[in-house]
Amino acid sequence: MRPAAAALLLAACAHGPSAKALKTAEIHHDLALEALQKGAPQDALREYDLALEADPSMAEAHMGRGLVMEYGLGRLPDAEAEYRRAIQLRPSYSSAHNNLGQLLARTGRPEEAIKEFDEALASAFYREPWVARCNKGQALYAMGRREDGLAELHRCLSIAPRYCGGRRELGLILLNEGKLKDALEELGTYARDCDKVVDAHLQLAQARMKAGDVAGARASFERCLELAKGAPSGDACRKGLELLQ
């Protein structure tokens, strides 16, 4: 190959995917999201793979693959690799840092996790900083840094008072510490602000049982069952009601 022709070929490769390829990748990415919403992880994985065939540098597709690996297939090492690949492609990708952080935390690496949460929070463009703050708070608490952990959780909720995950985790921590009054307040807010979430009413019901509030527990278990509509998520609520008979 002549030097001039080789230079032209290299220049063409350096430009990356064409506009058509980028559009194709975007379409497959959107189809993957639809598959995830329908509870079809294998279909989602196939669409993410097609997105990456069209655009190998699509960080969102790698993060999506990570979510499928972690939550759909339980393949945690593969999920970690995908999150890291997404970050490699886009170092300021806050959502990928947060997802990697929560995976590191759940696999017993809280110190590494906190670094990832801090990376997520370093970006002014992160759309959901309260999520990383809540996750960081839980990691700090798990490390034995109780005050720091609770401070992060409160900071999370000061930013997003209606964040269901934050209310849940703070409420459960307080419950486990034996602070029933404070726990009931947090879990009550969780159930009120996240009324359509089955778990919110389950957690409140169980806390009310611990507090000896039988009538309140029964009402929460009944609301939980009403929302579950026969799904497996309502089994714990059904068992709770049976205990109150």
Name the predicted role of every residue range.
Residues 20, 54, 89, 123-125, ...:
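Structural marker of alpha-solenoid helical repeat scaffolds
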Residues 36, 63, 70-71, 98, ...:
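Position-specific recognition of the canonical hydrophobic site in helix A of tetratricopeptide repeat
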